[in-house]
Amino acid sequence: MIGLVGKKIGMTRIFTEEGTSIPVTVIELKENRITQVKNINTDLYCAIQVTTGIKKSNRLNKPQSGHFLKSGVTPGRGLWEFRTDKNNNFKIGQSITINIFNNVKKVDITGISKGKGFSGTVKRWNFHTQDATHGNSLSHRVPGSIGQNQTPGRVFKGKKMAGQLGNTRVTVQSLNIVRIDEHRNLLLVKGAVPGATGSDLIVKPAIKV
């Protein structure tokens, strides 16, 4: 299922005819250019590789320069892939625009969430705090026990503990499309999406309709 790579512009709100305020995220979806078409014979799977935006040639390393030169496509700010079926008719250099969402009501959006740094268990995992008084000394926000005793004699993998919060790949599913502005290449979706303003987002038609 193909989609588009865009940029998060920010959040605002729009009003319906009834006067209801709807919070929306504005996403800029400029044309995506196909740089490579992968197939079963050469790559063992079917996909298209796309780029968007413009990147100066002096900012590219040699592998990137060679890749864009071979495809004959203007260098973009990154490379992304979308899986396709065997009978796709995509060609290198072809452009994919915001028009693919004309008959779509909901989308799934993937991005890198805002990094919050090293965080404790209360902030990271919503742990309850311990008693503020009643004999509690310096243990108000500590996680408590992280295991048992000699059996099993280890801490289980995946144990919720303090660590880095955010800066991970996150997907928000089934966001309603509120408006599409084809002239300015803008997509307005209801609600919030992952990432900071200016970050890259992958927008696909929703899997769960």
Curated annotation (Swiss-Prot):
Q: Which residues carry this modification: N5-methylglutamine?
A: Q150
Where would one find the signal peptide in this protein? Answer: none
Could you tell me which SUPFAM superfamilies the record lists for this protein?
A: Translation proteins (SSF50447)
Question: Which GO CC annotations does the UniProt entry carry?
Answer: cytosolic large ribosomal subunit
Q: Which Pfam families match?
A: Ribosomal_L3 (PF00297)
Q: Which GO terms describe its biological process?
A: translation
Keywords for the protein's UniProt record, in alphabetical order: Methylation, Ribonucleoprotein, Ribosomal protein, RNA-binding, rRNA-binding
Q: How is it modified post-translationally?
A: Methylated by PrmB.
- UniProt-recorded Gene Ontology molecular function terms: rRNA binding; structural constituent of ribosome
Belongs to which family?
Belongs to the universal ribosomal protein uL3 family.
User: Cross-referenced PANTHER family, in alphabetical order?
Assistant: 50S RIBOSOMAL PROTEIN L3, LARGE RIBOSOMAL SUBUNIT PROTEIN UL3C
How does it associate, per the subunit comment? Part of the 50S ribosomal subunit. Forms a cluster with proteins L14 and L19.
**Official protein name in the record:** Large ribosomal subunit protein uL3
Q: Which organism is it from?
A: Buchnera aphidicola subsp. Acyrthosiphon pisum (strain APS)
Q: Source gene?
A: rplC
